[in-house]
């Protein structure tokens, strides 16, 4: 294996090289106070081309959706159309400031207002906030809204949130952050919420249920309406984790199912870039009875249009708002990208997105089910979960995932959901063609063969990447962020 030891920018430095030429100042030169100056500031000295090549080289160590297939289950790593980027860079969007008077940013506000309306139409909810920064933040917002609703009715006994055992870890985390007790609800033999267990847990101390549908097994809950009714019958509300909305676009509206509040992951369903911790966006939609609790402000129409004037957009405060959850108005650049994506697709196109996402996942499932065990094996939605082990071979899901990197594929999500042993969670998304799906299926089939004949090839994988297998636990626990500092750096 070749382990590339990357030179740091300090090691590339050579005295006298420079990448910038400062223009002559247009103000009189002045002496800086001695106290502000340092004799020793070991900044690297490099030409522009050295810096560009350094970072370009580093960027190639990263896998990206622009570089290859990225079937990371639950994360919906679909291709991000470049027109989204063009629109987000339009100066009228990119160079406005959230503190500008509303009269000067009517276009931005019209975009936000229209996006709120479109998300309402797509999801079947009565009102939407665009503030939350990501899905998990949307969950926190939604749970705070649920609590505020109970409280407004004088119903203060409710302290429990019900969460299925297949849920994403953010669900218990965001409920826990608001001080609620988490009650785990098991799944039944077909991967649905276990109705008997749900009934047993429902009483007048329940705030609600956090439901992911389709769930993280990629399965549509066969009793979703009954699940929602059981929770409503005990006075609880149903939170919808909307991370899997990609499977439903134009087909099912969560609001129509009776879900009370839900977050959207714009960076998943609506193709805004994610990965690497970049900004996401997690708007929250609510049914009519929760609209007045939304975070403040939301974009509204201050003066209706008439024959001479377009409408005047501005900010309005919901009557019993839970308050602000984000500085300014959310991640506006993501809103522009989402607006563009929805406008480019239109209703028919969005429905096709869901249909092809589901078709692609079922195609892969059909190609792989003979090779890998699929514990809850029924028609899947936009993703499915297989077991990452091979009969008679000593390999784990992690070995299979790492070996896929040698075939130039991003590994699927592994070891989640927790209820599946050695989970490999595969989400191809709609943007991949049949050739790519076939190549991926063939790689996984070949790896299953290798697991039996040359298992050490898997144990030591990946072999082709700049770095081999890293100790992920150690990397997380003992994160070293400043290894680039020169040894003699004056701390
Ligand atoms: C991604 C995801 C979340 C969290 O969303 P973020 O935008 O990453 O915070 C929650 N639930 C499910 C099922 C997810 O896939």
Task: Label each PLM-derived region with a short phrase.
Residues 338-340:
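Active-site-proximal cap/loop segments of hydrolase catalytic domains
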Residues 63-83, 131-139, 270-285, 289-290, ...:
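Conserved phosphate/anionic-ligand binding catalytic regions in large, soluble enzymes, centered on
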Residues 107, 138-312, 319-320, 395, ...:
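Conserved PLP-enzyme active-site core in the AAT-like
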């Amino acid at each position: 294996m070749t382990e590339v030891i990357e030179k740091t920018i300090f090691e590339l430095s050579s005295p006298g090289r420079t990448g910038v030429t400062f223009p002559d100042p247009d103000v009189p030169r002045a002496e800086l106070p001695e106290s502000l100056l340092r004799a020793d500031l070991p900044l690297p000295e490099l030409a522009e081309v050295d810096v560009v090549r350094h970072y370009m080289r580093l960027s190639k160590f990263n896998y990206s959706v622009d570089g290859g297939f990225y079937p990371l289950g639950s994360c919906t790593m679909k291709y991000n159309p470049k027109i989204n980027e063009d629109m987000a860079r339009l100066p009228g969007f990119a160079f406005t400031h959230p503190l500008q008077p509303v009269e000067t940013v009517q276009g931005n506000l019209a975009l936000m207002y229209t996006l709120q309306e479109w998300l309402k139409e797509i999801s079947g909810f009565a009102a939407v906030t665009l503030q939350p920064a990501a899905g998990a933040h949307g969950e926190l917002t939604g749970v705070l809204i649920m609590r505020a609703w109970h409280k407004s009715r004088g119903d203060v006994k409710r302290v429990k949130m019900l969460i299925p055992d297949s849920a994403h870890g953010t669900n218990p985390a965001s409920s826990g952050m608001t001080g609620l007790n988490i009650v785990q609800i098991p799944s039944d033999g077909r991967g649905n919420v276990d109705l008997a267990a749900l009934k047993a847990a429902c009483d007048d101390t329940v705030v609600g249920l956090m439901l992911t549908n389709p769930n993280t097994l990629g399965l549509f809950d066969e009793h979703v309406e009954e699940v929602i009714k059981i929770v409503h019958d005990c006075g609880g509300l149903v939170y919808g984790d909307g991370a899997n909305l990609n499977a439903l676009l134009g087909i099912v509206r969560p609001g129509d199912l009776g879900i009370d509040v839900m977050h959207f992951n714009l960076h998943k369903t609506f193709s805004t870039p994610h990965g690497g911790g970049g900004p996401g966006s997690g708007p929250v939609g609510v049914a009519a009875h929760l609209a007045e609790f939304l975070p403040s402000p939301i974009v509204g129409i201050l003066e209706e249009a008439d024959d001479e004037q377009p409408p005047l957009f501005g900010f309005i405060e919901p009557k019993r708002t839970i308050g602000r959850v984000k500085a300014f108005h959310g991640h506006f650049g993501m809103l522009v990208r989402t607006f563009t994506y929805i406008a480019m697709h239109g209703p028919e196109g969005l429905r096709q997105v869901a249909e092809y996402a589901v078709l692609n996942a079922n195609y892969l499932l059909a190609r792989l089910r003979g090779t890998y065990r699929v514990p809850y094996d029924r028609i899947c939605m936009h993703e499915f979960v297989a077991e990452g082990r091979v009969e008679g071979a000593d390999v784990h899901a992690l070995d299979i995932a790492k070996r896929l990197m040698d075939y130039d594929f991003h590994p699927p999500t592994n070891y989640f959901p927790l209820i599946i042993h050695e989970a490999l969670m595969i989400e191809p998304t709609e943007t991949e063609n049949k050739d790519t799906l076939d190549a991926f299926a063939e790689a996984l089939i070949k790896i299953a063969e290798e697991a039996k004949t040359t298992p050490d090839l898997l144990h030591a994988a990946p072999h082709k990447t700049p770095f081999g297998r890293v100790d992920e636990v150690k990397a997380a626990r003992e994160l070293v962020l400043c290894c680039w500092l020169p040894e003699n750096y004056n701390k």
